[in-house]
């Protein structure tokens, strides 16, 4: 990277760790970029004249007399309509073989939107996945995590959401992905002909881990451009936030900071909140909605990353494998969208809230019946019907490979009610039963 004549050059490094180097410098600011022996770095700590730089590629081969040049700016992204359909690395450079982007250069990582400029979310975000749209409906401007075990197909779910979501733009931020994952997303988007509305920022396992820290800010800067400048409905998909948190822990550890719970930095809550609070519904019509995958270590929901995430976000979505049908579903018991009441029955059909509640209640009755059966108790006729209902409900609605619009989901649910139960057993208002109960049942 070329340096300018007026840029001050430092050549005395006082301390070097695996990811950081320290020196004395003046007139510099937090998050400012620098080059250390030609390697890109970012300023992460200031204590008087003592500053610490995080070197993205690692400090191997850097001597104590290395040339350090501060660039006078934070990481930036060039924003324009040319972003659509492109794949970028953590620095906003194209990695798809296409031309450089032309546009306005914007610093990433700015503040979240002032609350007085926000509008209460009121628009439905449809994904085609019934476990979301039917039971845990999403609203524009919402922030929600996807909790999943590492062996579950969460990237497939993210790709499906990107292709099905009824939004103007999709921004994908991938952190710690394998090259296979990167190629999977690229091929799926290309084959579906959906590249024109998707922007992707990728960090793979072959890239330095600390580069992951830039991915969310890059993705959200692009999202803000489309939401503010074009008044577009933007959905940001981030995967995997556990990889992001691991990178935070690496930097914190190498800066000799005292770790908090599960070896995470004490700033974890603030670092996560800074990302999730970018979700917003603008009065002008544009919006940023965030769905972020957080993988669980051994299914441990009490780990610092999912634990802090739960306090910040507006609900959570859980993936689990249903052993009865052999498919991955969105778990109706552990999932919750805290804003769904803003759109269910208002932006969707009027029977939506009651159908949703009735289906989950019957599914819970089936879980109780299964427990009775496993403990050797006799099953009633109702128990047997709930078990049969639960299997079809999982297969036809909860499975992540099912793609229906909300009206079709409701019709399927009514069909299952009519197949296995009498109207009085589903506990839905008579006026709705009279209108939607399957005829001839």
Region annotations inferred by a language model:
Residues 1-86, 91-95:
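N-terminal accessory targeting/assembly segments
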Residues 9, 39, 64, 83, ...:
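Residue-level signal for beta-strand positions within conserved beta-sheet cores that form or flank
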Residues 9, 17, 30, 83, ...:
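A generic structural signal for well-ordered coil/turn residues at beta-strand boundaries
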Residues 18, 48, 92, 113, ...:
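Residues that form or immediately flank small-molecule/cofactor binding pockets and catalytic motifs
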Residues 46, 56, 90, 111, ...:
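Generic beta-structure capping elements
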Residues 66-68, 82, 95-142, 155-160, ...:
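P-loop NTPase nucleotide-binding/switch module
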Residues 75-79, 94-99, 116-122, 230, ...:
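Active-site phosphate-binding and catalytic loops of NTP-dependent enzymes
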Residues 134-137, 141-441:
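P-loop NTPase catalytic core
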